[in-house]
Amino acid sequence: VTFKFPVGPSKGRCNICGQDTDLTENHVPPKAWAQGIALRVSSVADAISGEKKPRSHKMPNGVCFRSICRTCNGSVLSRYDKALVSMSREVTEILRDRSKVTYYQSIRIQPQLVARGVLGHMSSVGLNRYEERHSQHLFDDRSDLLRQVRLHYWVYPYSGRTVLRDFGLCVLGGKGSSAVYVLKAYPLAFAMVWNREFQFEDWQPRSFDSFAGFEPDQEASLPLEFVGLPGQVWPEHVQGSTIALLHSDGAFVAKEKRRG
C-alpha cells in the first residue's frame, strides 16, 4: 500500500474520543519534537520490500494522520505533548554538547504525562481506530496506565522516524509475545509493551515502571544511557529466536530526503 499524507478524511470517527466529527491533522511524533526536516514516508511493508527505491511520499514533518478531532488534538493532547517535547529537547541539548555525553546522565521529566503523550500519538495512527483502552488513559491522567503497559525508552541518535502501531513480537520456545507500539525519532525512542511479562530477547531498555504510582504532574529524575545502545532498526529488525508481526496500515518509516 502506498499512502498519501496526511492520511484520512476531513470527517469521521475520532481515534481518541470515538465521536463522529470533523477531523484534524496530528503529527507523529509531535510537530515541535523535530521541525523543518524534509522526509519521505513509506509503509514498513514497502520499506522492507527489497526494492531499491521503495514507494514513498514527500512529507515535511514526518508521519501525519487526519484521525482525531480538534478537541482531542487540543485540550486532551496538548498537555501531554508539552511534557513529551520537553523531554526530547532536554536530550537534544545533551547530545549537542559532547562534554555532557558521558556513560550516564539524567533529566527531569513528568513521566505520567510523557507516557500519555506517547499513547496519544500512537492512538492517532491509522483510520477509524478508536480503542476504549486508549481513551480511558488519555481522559484520566490518574489511571493505571503504567501498571497496564511497560514503557521502555532509550536514546536514539539516528535520523529518520519509525512509527509502529500494528506491530508485535514473539520469542519462540514459549518465551512470550506482546503487541508493541514503537515510536522512534531523534533523539528518543519508546516501546510501549502491552504484555508486561514480555522480555526482549537481546536487550532490555530502561522503563517507566518505577513511576507507576506518580501523580500526573509529579516530576522525576530519568536516567539516560549513551553507551551500549541498539542499532537504528531495533527492535523491528529481529534476529535469533524472535519473530515480528506487522500490518502495513499502522507501520511507517520516514527517512530524510536525499539532497541533489
Tell me what each language-model feature is.
Residues 1-7, 56-133:
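Catalytic cores of phosphodiester-bond-cleaving enzymes
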Residues 1-81:
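An N-terminal structural lobe/cap that precedes and organizes the functional/catalytic core
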Residues 37-41, 92-96, 141:
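Short amphipathic alpha-helical patches
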Residues 47-54, 97-101, 168, 210-212:
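Low-complexity, polar-biased intrinsically disordered regions enriched in Pro/Ser/Thr/Gly
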Residues 42-45, 88-90, 202, 210-213:
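Short, low-complexity, polar/charged sequence segments that are solvent-exposed and flexible
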Residues 14-17, 118, 183, 190-192:
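Generic structural hydrophobic/aromatic packing signal, biased to beta-strands
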Residues 50-51, 61, 103-108, 217-232:
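Low-complexity, flexible helical/coil segments
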Residues 131-260:
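C-terminal, charged low-complexity interaction regions
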